[in-house]
Regions:
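Nucleic-acid endo/exonuclease domains
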Residues: 1-112
Length: 112
């Protein structure tokens, strides 16, 4: 199965890498390709276009994939494309994701 990374996912991926996040692009989890995966923190990031919210079938398929990832211990963050178009908003989005990652790792390793 071939997968093509969207421009929006690439922009967020590079913004996270710039912040030192050990992100992996298009990671296969045995079921599907994750746009951006951070296995160390057990977090998956999906960068979603409009069709993910306007199409019932797509939205339900996304929810099911989120559920099955959750059963494996992974939390999925869904980022709408609108948060990566503008550089200012992209940077703010990446900063918030770094905050989520730090909190996740702190909880995993009992640092709080």
């Amino acid at each position: 199965m071939s997968t093509q990374t969207t421009e929006e996912a690439l922009k967020l991926y590079f913004a996270l890498k710039k912040r030192g996040v050990p992100a992996e692009l298009e990671k296969f989890d045995g079921y599907k390709h994750i746009d951006i995966a951070i296995p160390e923190a057990k977090i998956n990031i999906e960068v979603d276009g409009k069709h993910h919210n306007s199409n019932n079938r797509q939205a339900l398929a996304d929810l099911k994939r989120t559920y099955f990832s959750f059963l494996k211990g992974y939390y999925t963050i869904r980022i709408p494309n609108s948060l990566v178009y503008n550089d200012y908003v992209l940077n703010e989005t990446a900063d918030f994701i770094v905050g989520i990652l730090n909190e996740s790792l702190n909880k995993q390793y009992g640092l709080r």
